[in-house]
Amino acid sequence: MSEQEGNQSEHQSEHVGESEGKLPNETPTTSQSTNASTGTAGKGEKKSSDGDPAAANPATKLTPSMAESLLELNPALRSELAGMDKEKATEALRQMNISDLLTGLSVNPKNQKDMASFKFWQTQPVIRFDDRESESPDGPIKIVELDQVSREPIPLVDGFEWVTLDIDDEADVKEFYELLANHYVEDGSAMFRFNYSPAFLNWALKAPGWKREWHVGVRASKSGKLVASICGVPAEIAVRGKSLKVTEINFLCVHKKLRSKRLTPVLIKEITRRCYLNGIYQAIYTVGIMLPTPVSACRYYHRALDWLKLHEVGFSPLPIGSTKSRQVTRNHLPGHTSTPGLRPMQSKDIDAVQDLLNRYLKRFDLSQIFSRKEVDHLLLHKEKPGAEQIVWSYVAEEPGTHRITDFAAFYSLESSVLQNSKHKNVKAAYLYYYATETAFAEKEKGLKERLLMLINDVLILAKKERFDVMNALTLHDNPLFLEQLKFGAGDGQLHYYLFNYRTAPIAGGVNDKNLPDERKRGGVGVILV
């Protein structure tokens, strides 16, 4: 399962194998555009005519010089087309879905590093860039013969050995936490770093059906120090209506001083081997950079809950012509929620939430299918003395009938502030899953209005819990409310990948200008923590 690494501002190598060894699913809260005024992007630009093929697919207008620039930003794509002359490469690009590809590029060019030895990726069952327009049906790229899968671990370079991380062992969890804290994802300016607490790791890595052998570590043989990791958890997803048992890959991390040891491809091969032995032949993962080949790409958006603090830590700049007090006022939220019957989720709501959420998610081309146990583990906080809360979930209960009509959740992932004398952390909430019965009305009548009210209430509740920012992607039905609820565009992109499964590109909620577009909904409906 090819979980990748990155060094990106919203989740981001030289080579796979010589790279920075990091692969997150979210990113530290860094944005130079957060909560600048929204709604003005694209003014003065002409809309493409639906009847103009060139307008519909910008690739048809590519010149050789434009193609050269595109390839410069895409080491992966450049590797795929190596050996072609400029005209042939340009023609090859014209045949690809460049509109989707451009939308999928990170907004920040410095995030486009080569994850390379694409010799490695060419050996893996992943979609090639030049296969985007393939007429091949959806399905596995490679049929795995279980009797040909090695029972022995992939050999490591001398001086290192495989270990299984014990998430139940306090010492192991502490060491894993320290590896991630010091060597996992930072933003591009090295101002923020994820702070994965032991409680978060237990929540993320011990979902129902979790397997201890999928928590893979590498130690230095002499010192016993943990120097690398890659993890997986089982899940069931639906791809265009077809159910798949997959592994969600996460926490690929290599110690900064060991990124010349070619550990990354070995980690990928080893987690793949272990999953194959358990009869799981597909995986899903998210990366902030472009690799072969994303099935979708979503953009990050951020909503300030404590704008002044975000400004003081360097997250939210002061827009030209504005003042601090004006920005604080602009981001003010009401003191009370508006959704009738809204209350914290309880254990008695599990069945109703599972039913509502799964029906809601069926509307998307790529979505998770939740079991009752997964709803219980991932979406319901259990009150325990001294226990850290990771997820906050709410339901709207209809008066009289007591029917659950709405559900919404967010989870917490704190980021450490690395270079600030006043603040040591940013408390970030991530918009998680939500669902509403309004989605099933004819022509989705009232859906936008309902979500504007429901998610605004989520912002209010997160503010009351003293969160500083709410992060969200352009997936689910988020394009209906992001800009109106004052979410600001971030500088990061999150690409979705399927390992050993081919499907056509899936909408990521953004248009060709990389802006939220209500017409681009219905694509991504799965969130990897």
Swiss-Prot record:
It is found in: Cytoplasm. Tetradecanoyl-CoA binds at residues 118-121, 252-254, 260-264. Disulfide bonds: none annotated. Keywords: Acyltransferase, Cytoplasm, Transferase. It catalyses: N-terminal glycyl-[protein] + tetradecanoyl-CoA = N-tetradecanoylglycyl-[protein] + CoA + H(+). Residues 1-65 are annotated as: Disordered. One of its GO terms (molecular function) is glycylpeptide N-tetradecanoyltransferase activity. Residues 11-23 have a biased composition (Basic and acidic residues). It comes from the Eukaryota. Its EC number is 2.3.1.97. One of its GO terms (cellular component) is cytoplasm. The keyword Nucleotidyltransferase does not apply. The active site is at 529 (proton acceptor). Residues 1-10, 26-40 have a biased composition (Polar residues). Adds a myristoyl group to the N-terminal glycine residue of certain cellular proteins. Belongs to the NMT family. Monomer. This is Glycylpeptide N-tetradecanoyltransferase. The lineage of its organism: Eukaryota, Fungi, Dikarya, Ascomycota, Pezizomycotina.
